[in-house]
Amino acid sequence: MRVHIGTDHAGFELKEKVVAHLREAGHDVVDHGANTYDALDDYPPFCIEAAQAVVDEPGSLGIVIGGSGNGEQMAANCVEGVRAALVWSDATARLAREHNDANVVAVGARQHREEEALALIDAFLETPFSGDERHQRRIDLMKDYERSVRA
């Protein structure tokens, strides 16, 4: 699977480990930065670029990482067509995909040990959208609103 990833300085070290982990698992990972550690960098450009790539490449998924994951999720959700979910447990990671068809996952590097973060990302990537009518209806309502305010 093609996976787009973006982070700032707070998630840089974890991102490097996530990229290696995913490539070892056979995923095609596109790293949208940060490419070097810079304590003064800003997360929006990296996260927006990764999120836009997910929209531009249907079937791909995205990962954004920061200190808490909150701002990174918000930045990714600025991109039309993105449904980014901040996850903190196996259940939230799986439900983001199963019920909400989330296409970007946000993880807080300062909130989880490396093993926990990798498990959250794996759970997100391996869980398909259920396709249940009620979940699709809710997603369609969000898409309709998104289109109406951007028109």
Each predicted region: which residue ranges?
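C-terminal binding/interaction regions
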Residues: 2-6, 10-11, 90-151
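Glycine-rich phosphate/diphosphate-binding loop of Rossmann-like nucleotide-binding domains
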Residues: 5-24
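A general structural signal for well-ordered alpha-helical segments in protein cores
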Residues: 15, 47, 72, 117-118, ...
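Short helix-loop-beta junction
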Residues: 20-29, 81
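A short beta-strand-loop structural module common to alpha/beta enzyme folds
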Residues: 28-39
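N-terminal entry motif of extracellular EGF-like repeats
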Residues: 42
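Helix-adjacent hinge/juxtasegments
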Residues: 46-87
